[in-house]
Amino acid sequence: LAMESVYAILKRKPATRLYHGQTIRALINIIDRSNMTTEGFKFDKTAFVIEWVKRDLLNIAFGNSDNHGRNTAFLRDETTIWLSPIYDFAPMKADPEGIARSIIWQNDNGQTLELGGRYDFIAICESLSDLIEPSILLKELKQTAEKLVDLTNRLQQRGVSEKILSHPAIAFDYLPKRLQDWGLL
C-alpha cells in the first residue's frame, strides 16, 4: 500500500494556496497520464470528485479550516487508486491563531465561490460540470447536509466540549440555517 499527499502529487511546496477546481482537474490529469492508469489501475474519477467536495463540506461544517495539501492524500494498492481516509481533522477555526483555508473555491473566471463563511454550492457544482453532472453532485451534497442538521446534538452526546460547540467562528448552532442558505437543505 502506498500513500501520497496532494502537495506531493502536484509537486507543490507546503503552504501553497490551491483552488479546488484546478486541483481536482490537475490530480485527475496527473493520475490519468500516469503509467499506473495506462497499465490498468482503476481510478473512479466521478467518485473522487464527489468525495472531494463532500469532504470539503465536512471541513466547513466541523470548522476544520486546515485543509492544505498535506491533509489530503491518495492510497494505491496493486490495482486501484483512491482518496485515503480523512486524517488530521479538527475544528481549527477555534485555534487562537486563526487558521485560514488553504484550498478555496473559485470558478474558471477566478470569481470566488466562498466568501466570509458563505459558500455557493450550486455554483461549485456547476464549476465542475466538465467532470460530473452538477445535479448528481448536488444530490450527494444534499444527502450529506441532511446528516449534518443535528450535528451539535451528536457532538454533545459524544462529549465535545462546550467551548468548541459554542465557538462563534465555527457556529455549530447555525449550521442548519447555513446549509439552507448554501442551497443544500
What is the predicted function of each stretch?
Residues 1-69, 73-185:
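Anionic ligand-binding catalytic core segments
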